[in-house]
């Protein structure tokens, strides 16, 4: 089958995911497409995940991390400019059962040429010495498959763990939780130093050696349609957060001079549907009155600040200030 490739130069995650969908939905189906792309400082969550359950909201806010939902299932991943993403888009005929190894092996073979022994391991990972450096997922519809994967080449592993860190004892969700795995960077295993741009070039060359092809000539109409899709879906709160299934979060903290405060937060479609306070605190007014202020707001610092407004929190939790309550709701 003829192959066309797109080597994307933007690092905007909402644009890159919009481009994937546009290629999948709109470009001619008489060929296979291969894409290379990078996202800068982003968390990409799986289609069926609860965004709030997957991210460290404080780290996301402080580091300016962009959060975008993709079309395929699977777990949440952190992308920075030390990570390279690849995508195959092609027809699969009548069968929707496709082995992910088919699309992972070109990465394995490319690494072999650089002296690194990698292997496809488990359901959707590529590993080196048992450590994961590539996670893969697929979106299949109407006889067509989009297979995409990450390649952690020289990512900041501290930020990878921090951005996705959520205490599993504090949250219950109907969405699909990401499976945390031991991870590694490809660069650590290379016998000779190779920069990421050079690796990107080598991978593309190897793909084209196995599947001769040429760059796909996107038109101005194509680019305008991608931008429209980005703006209307991948850059929207409704898609990235509001699509989330229901979850219940527990935030708890003991505060000197106040006591133990527990907040049970139920989130549906990305907004608070219910909130219940429990604990051994003293209260001059019923905490349920305060809890009602939060219904309909987003479960983040901005949402909590808006919900509380100029409410005197100490009426409901003796000895507690508004900023302290917001910290509890955000961090536990």
Task: Label each PLM-derived region with a short phrase.
Residues 39-41, 120-130:
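Short, glycine/charge-rich beta-strand/loop segments that flank catalytic centers
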Residues 223-268:
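Structured beta-strand/loop patches that form or line metal/cofactor-binding pockets in enzymes
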Residues 137-138, 151, 253, 261-279:
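Short beta-strand elements
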Residues 90-96, 187-193, 278-283:
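A generic structural motif
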Residues 83-124:
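Contiguous, small/hydrophobic- and glycine-enriched helical/loop subdomains that border
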Residues 70-85, 126-128, 132, 137-146:
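FAD-binding core of FAD-dependent oxidoreductases
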Residues 107, 114, 134, 142-241, ...:
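Long, positively charged amphipathic alpha-helical accessory segments at protein N-termini or as interdomain linkers
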Residues 1-98:
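N-terminal lobe of the biotin/lipoate ligase/transferase fold
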